[in-house]
Amino acid sequence: MGWLYALHARSSIARGRALQANHWINGVCDQVIMLACLRQGLPAHEGRGVDDLPAGLRHSLAETLVRELDARELRRAFTAAVGTLLAEAQQVDPNREQRLRKTVWELVHTAHGYVIPLGR
């Protein structure tokens, strides 16, 4: 589901819907927290195990927090959220992560204004 939240986050950023983008970026992070907690054998419901995750992952999650509701900051947090999502997906299911990687990074690139040529 994280990729779907990423799609909505990217669309919200493009439309200038800052609070909505923040909502969807947080949704990406919620999916990362759930996956990481399950993988670590921690309570996943309502983020109850998040503070017990390894320090490096907690740091990565902190980087996904939106600090300001401007487009540049939303893109920064979105990029961090997608990177953290893919890193966790790699730990849980490398084959699925590989299938999602290109598409999800294209969402990030287009959120930053880069044009992805058709047919790629």
Positions of PLM-derived features:
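Conserved nucleotidyltransferase catalytic core and NTase-mimicking acidic/glycine-rich helix/loop elements
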Residues: 1-120
